[in-house]
Amino acid sequence: MSGFLASLDPRRVQWGAAWYAMHSRILRTKPVESMLEGTGTTSAHGTKLAQVLTTVDLISLGVGSCVGTGMYVVSGLVAKEMAGPGVIVSFIIAAVASILSGVCYAEFGVRVPKTTGSAYTYSYVTVGEFVAFFIGWNLILEYLIGTAAGASALSSMFDSLANHSISRWMVDTVGTLNGLGKGEESYPDLLALVIAVIVTIIVALGVKNSVGFNNVLNVLNLAVWVFIMIAGLFFINGKYWAEGQFLPHGWSGVLQGAATCFYAFIGFDIIATTGEEAKNPNTSIPYAITASLVICLTAYVSVSMILTLMVPYYAIDTESPLMEMFVAHGFYAAKFVVAIGSVAGLTVSLLGSLFPMPRVIYAMAGDGLLFRFLAHVSSYTETPVVACIVSGFLAALLSLLVSLRDLIEMMSIGTLLAYTLVSVCVLLLRYQPESDIDGFVKFLSEEHTKKKEGILADCEKETCSPVSEGEEFSSPATNTCGAKNLPSLGDNEMLIGKSDKSAYNVNHPNYGTVDMTTGIEADESENIYLIKLKKLIGPRYYTMRIRLGLPGKMDRPTAATGHTVTICVLLLFILMFIFCSFIIFGSEYISGQSWWAILLVVLMMLLISVLVFVILQQPENPKKLPYMAPCLPFVPAFAMLVNIYLMLKLSTITWIRFAVWCFVGMLIYFGYGIWNSTLEISAREQALHQSTYQRYDVDDPFSVEEGFSYATEGESQEDWGGPAEDKGFYYQQMSDAKANSRTSSKAKSKSKHKQNSEALIANDELDCSPE
């Protein structure tokens, strides 16, 4: 019926084809083979990025991008206005939430190590082109605002050290810019403009130069941190933590402070953007992400302890808390020492925002989603110099015209959105069949690869010892190549995998879903948490798994289970969004203990738990990576919940500005990117190739009769017997009747050839029989 209606209305066919074409474009994914180890990534001008970053360099970048504003600004702000001395607990909660997203980032950094676009690249190869552009575009906004805010913060720091003489001179000489910032004294910050330009030049000069500069500032910041810890011990007073003063605003203040403290950990994703420039990204990226978060947590907690023990929480200065806490005790010289650390820390934070921004632009321009001239890599500095200059200029312009307070309000929404998407991608990929994640799972864990190579090498070194006949027949299992030196049964299982004969049965549900030669991945050493759980529960562990419907070790994901996980993750995201919205905007009904509000919260929590449990029941892909996020699906699901909650805590004006930025991005994507992406150009070339040359089916068995052309009745040899190259376009436009006639002729010739062959075989058998 639908075909009949379509034949009556050609516009229906046109709209359907247009929708299908647009749908396929926005959901197309980038093949990952070009980004795997050994392939390298080359810019549009043929120059590769330099691979010079070590694990220490990556840790330094991660720490520097976080610790500046967190230690010198956020600690005092949260302690005074939200949590009091409980800011320590707030930082710990925020760190746990950040680590949840960090482990997901670490797994993606191992899956696609040779990348420059962080969450943009991860989403491009998993979710699709449109979502990838959306995430990349908002990461650019995040880094752009972070750079401008860092330059403005440094300008304010210098102005504070100069007793605000710089700002007064600006207002008296240049004037104010009413409307661009909050307050009547908003002025064009020329000092912030100069700072942004200088840092842009440093980043554009080369990775090694900028990272070296970053390392020097981090060492200086570390020295100031040690000074604060030692000097502060002489002025601490335990009465400021007396009963009733540690949590002056209760646990609600601690949780509110945790939401603010979470922003102090934003920045570790810079590590994921440098994968192409890291010497060994497979191991460096996960280690650097974890280490940087732990170091930042240590710095924040220790500084918060000293701050709240030196000064009552209600007397903390929110603009420069660490400098003023020594002034309160008359130690004026320490103010300038801390000021040096503040300048170093804020400079590193500024560098941490500017460093990844041109690399995201470079990755998007290299894929054709942004203008391709932005992907130019300088052959001298081996950096995306055009992207550096353009992004640095925009950041400098923002720092000149927009106040620091307005910039800070938009700093987190893009990053939180990227964190959420990375958690979603981890959930999707771990439960998809192997055929759906081609390039991601083509390599094994380096540790197991080295272990296998060592076992095989040891086996080859052993010489074969002679064995007597008696030994050979009496012990058929004896190995003649030094069995005592061969690996144990567990090692053999690791090498060849346990045989699952049922999996080779065509009726087995997992038949054909995974390469049978890769049984090694399914029999890897189990997760340490599962081992502890087995010891705790005992034999009932397996009974419990069966009753809960959890998958077995040899179960493999199929297209059906992968689709189930995709639907569950989508519903989980929507339900979490509704749940967090109700918790935030309906808090008065919940606190008022309205029965319908409590019932709705319980119902949504129950539905979220059911969806997570359904995901848990699906089999995971058995491939192992050098680093994998633990405790799936709980860790990514909880990370999604925390990130969505923090996004909804942002102000309304932030969402409005975010919507305007997204609208500009959509104009660029649908006006330029979707038609000029590398995948679109490749698809056009492939379509042109298919329309120019006739494809032949080379899989059919060849017979002698097929080597010749037979003309059917009513059809001359001239019509189709000649070579295809001579027929050109008209050969491809052959009518269906002729094509069917030729197919029937070939089928008859094949049948005749088969009958002749069977007759010949029968005659040969008769000739060779003893009779």
UniProtKB/Swiss-Prot annotation:
Where is the protein found, in the record's own terms?
Answer: Lysosome membrane
Q: Which GO terms describe its molecular function?
A: gamma-aminobutyric acid transmembrane transporter activity
- Is the keyword Acyltransferase in the record? no
Disrupted-gene phenotype: Mutant mice exhibit slightly thinner retina, including outer retinal layer, and abnormal electroretinography at 2 and 6 months of age compared to wild-type animals. They are viable and fertile. They do not show any noticeable physical abnormalities.
Protein keywords: Amino-acid transport, Glycoprotein, Lysosome, Membrane, Phosphoprotein, Transmembrane, Transmembrane helix, Transport
Glycosylation sites recorded in the entry for this protein: N282, N676
> Its induction, per UniProt?
Up-regulated in liver in response to high-fat diet.
General function of this protein: Imports 4-aminobutanoate (GABA) into lysosomes. May act as a GABA sensor that regulates mTORC2-dependent INS signaling and gluconeogenesis. The transport mechanism and substrate selectivity remain to be elucidated.
- UniProt family annotation: Belongs to the amino acid-polyamine-organocation (APC) superfamily.
Q: What is this protein called?
A: Solute carrier family 7 member 14
